[in-house]
């Protein structure tokens, strides 16, 4: 058993030592002729504006009949004087 462990250690040491190269030797760099890569040409795309309408207070709470009251409470919490739900079920706050 000792012989097997010793042989395994020797094989491991040799396997680790084999890939070592001389650090002082000049490095050979083989570069392929480079073509201009088309994928690196990036185009600037215009930023699209994202418009998000708040529909929770008017759309989901309309089934319970509290849509206008919930919209008014929502607007009061935002510091406005009140609000109402329009025909598109979007909460519109007063100034």
From Swiss-Prot:
Which InterPro entries does this one have?
Defensin_invertebrate/fungal, Scorpion_toxin-like_sf
Question: What residue range is the signal peptide?
Answer: 1-17
* Top-level taxon in the UniProt lineage: Eukaryota
Localization recorded for this chain is: Secreted
Mind telling me which Gene3D superfamilies this protein's record contains?
Knottin, scorpion toxin-like (3.30.30.10)
Keywords associated with the record: Antibiotic, Antimicrobial, Defensin, Disulfide bond, Immunity, Innate immunity, Secreted, Signal
Please state the protein's primary subcellular location: secreted
A GO CC annotation recorded here is:
extracellular region
Any one GO biological process: humoral immune response
Which segments are removed on maturation as propeptide? 18-55
Q: Disulfide connectivity?
A: 58-85, 71-91, 75-93
Under SUPFAM superfamilies, the record lists: Scorpion toxin-like
Pfam families noted in UniProt:
Defensin_2
Q: What does this protein do?
A: Antibacterial peptide mostly active against Gram-positive bacteria.
Q: Report the family membership.
A: Belongs to the invertebrate defensin family. Type 1 subfamily.
What is the protein name stated in its UniProt record? Answer: Defensin
Q: Which organism is it from?
A: Formica aquilonia
């Amino acid at each position: 058993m000792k012989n097997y462990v010793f042989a395994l250690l020797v094989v491991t040491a040799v396997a680790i030592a084999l890939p070592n190269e001389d650090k002082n030797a000049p490095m050979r760099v083989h570069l392929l002729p480079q073509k201009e890569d088309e994928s690196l040409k990036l185009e600037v795309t215009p930023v699209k504006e994202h418009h998000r309408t708040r529909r929770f207070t008017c759309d989901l709470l309309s089934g319970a009949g509290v849509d206008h009251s919930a919209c008014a409470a929502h607007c009061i919490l935002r510091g406005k004087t009140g609000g109402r739900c329009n025909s598109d079920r979007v909460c519109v706050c007063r100034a």
